[in-house]
């Protein structure tokens, strides 16, 4: 039998540079959130989140095979996404790779290969050169003025890739499988539907929906979006690297 004993713990976190309070009812949520405990300690949380029994039931209706600890994690993530929209933050389903101080998002439907492509970057560019900021659901801050910023968060996907950090978002690459590698830059009109598919949009919250649309509109004017067909060869790394970074790919820098 799975251990689902409740023990509530209130955690003051800093997520996407916003102080929030998250109450954990089960140990799983507390464990994944610990790296994000607010070390400054002087900022009052802007809001508090706790998953109710009704929230767990909502998640269970979509995924009945999972335990309460896992469902709580999903419910709290959903609640944060709902609240973050009004603070110019969105959840962007992607694998976010940091390289040379900038973040690059690889987006695709689940199972298409975004994690595989990120792994290729780490393999061919070296662990010290490319690392995953968040492997599944990074937060993006898209302010009214200035650069969009990608943030790590506790929800890191099945690979568990990620860390508490941030970097300016310098490019988005939407992947699809293909026998040969090719890439093209999309204009905002051509990219908007692809980008919206990767964003969490608040449920039954018109103001939150409008806030997400505003973030996406600003994102598309500031961050280049690429559509790439790729395989799993080193040529895939070369193709995306040169387009996204604007620099020549010099070959594998990993330790032989």
Predicted regions and their residues:
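Glycine-rich, often acidic-flanked micro-motifs
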Residues: 2-34, 66, 86, 93-95, ...
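Core catalytic alpha/beta fold that binds nucleotide/phospho-ligands
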Residues: 30-37, 48-50, 54
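Conserved glycine(s) of the Walker
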Residues: 113
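Walker A/P-loop nucleotide-binding motif
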Residues: 110
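Post-Walker A alpha-helix
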Residues: 117-118
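Acidic-aromatic/histidine active-site loop/patch
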Residues: 2, 39-43
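Extreme N-terminal, non-catalytic leader segments
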Residues: 45-102
């Amino acid at each position: 039998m799975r251990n689902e004993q409740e023990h509530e713990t209130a955690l003051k976190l800093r997520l996407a540079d916003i102080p929030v309070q998250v109450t954990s009812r089960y140990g799983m949520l507390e464990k994944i959130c610990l790296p994000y405990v607010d070390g400054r300690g002087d900022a009052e949380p802007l809001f508090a989140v706790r998953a109710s029994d009704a929230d767990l039931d909502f998640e269970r209706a979509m995924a009945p095979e999972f335990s309460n600890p896992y469902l709580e994690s999903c419910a709290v993530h959903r609640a944060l996404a709902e609240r973050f929209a009004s603070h110019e933050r969105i959840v962007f389903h992607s694998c976010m790779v940091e390289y040379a101080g900038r973040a690059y998002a690889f987006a695709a439907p689940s199972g298409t290969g975004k994690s595989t492509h990120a792994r290729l970057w780490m393999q061919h560019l070296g662990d010290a050169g490319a690392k995953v900021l968040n492997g599944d659901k990074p937060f993006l801050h898209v302010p009214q003025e200035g650069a969009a910023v990608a943030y790590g968060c506790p929800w890191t996907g099945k690979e568990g890739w990620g860390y508490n950090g941030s970097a300016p978002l310098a490019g988005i690459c939407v992947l699809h499988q293909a026998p040969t590698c090719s890439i093209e830059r999309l204009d905002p009109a051509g990219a908007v539907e692809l980008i919206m598919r990767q964003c969490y949009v608040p449920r039954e919250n018109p103001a939150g929906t409008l806030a997400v649309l505003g973030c996406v509109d600003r994102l598309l004017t500031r961050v280049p979006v690429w559509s790439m067909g790729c395989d799993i060869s080193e040529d895939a790394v070369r193709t995306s690297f040169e387009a996204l970074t604007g620099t020549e790919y010099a070959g594998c820098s990993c330790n032989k």
